[in-house]
Amino acid sequence: MAHTSKTVIVTGGSQGIGSGAVQAFLDRDYNVVATSRNVTKSKDLPSSRKLALVDGDIGEATTAARVAETAISTFGSIDALVNNAGIFFTKPFTDYTAEDFKRLVSTNLDGFIYMTQLAIKQMLGQKSGGSIVSITASLADNPIAGVNASIPMITKGGINAITRSLAIEYAKDGIRVNAVAPGVVDTPMHTNSPKDFLKRLSPMGSISNVHEIVDAVIYLTEAPHVTGEVLHVDGGAHIGKW
């Protein structure tokens, strides 16, 4: 087990990939601040003196401010950020509404911007570098016929793009910025989806599990010479038609 006094923020930390990441970081002796709308009610998170929980909508700037302040006041630093909070739903393009778009932008983009700005400002002040890892989606690189997610992919593709831009902007400050792009992952988001259908969305004919995504997050958080990378964990779905 790695031993560290570093502090990581995990958004969308109450279940699925988020709660898996929280546990993995705790196992590696990180201090963790986890946030989601109702993270204090999560049954997937352990009780730990190294874990602080902050309820709130990450699409609101005040939530991001409270999360950053909790990290600094409780643990003294922000050394890593995992932008995991996100929403996703499919519709034909012409059925998406203006309200759908606002919801997607609020959580997927506004939340990313608010939290990442505060994390980078703190990292710059600490002068010890840092890591930012965001969860995007394989679909942003390779759409799949029958999975109508054009509007959500505006947000996920945007995060892929800003990941590369920020990696260049802050490279000399030692702040690394990367992303993990999953395909279908066995999380509560897909509880009611037919597993046979989901398996067909990958050339390997299988569904990723949370631990596989979390392993990628941990790798990118700790890899000292990797930045600007969008790491696909999708059974090959980003490659193209199969």
Predicted regions and their residues:
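Active-site helix of classical SDR
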Residues: 116, 155, 163
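Alpha-helical segment proximal to the catalytic Tyr-Lys
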Residues: 121, 164, 168-172
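Active-site loop of short-chain dehydrogenase/reductase
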Residues: 5-6, 77-78, 123-137, 172-175, ...
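Conserved glycine-rich cofactor-binding loop
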Residues: 14-15
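Conserved NAD(P)H cofactor-binding loop of Rossmann-fold oxidoreductase domains
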Residues: 84-89, 236
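C-terminal substrate-recognition "lid" of short-chain dehydrogenase/reductases
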Residues: 175, 209-233, 238
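Substrate-binding pocket helix/loop in short-chain dehydrogenase/reductase
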Residues: 92-93, 100-105, 198
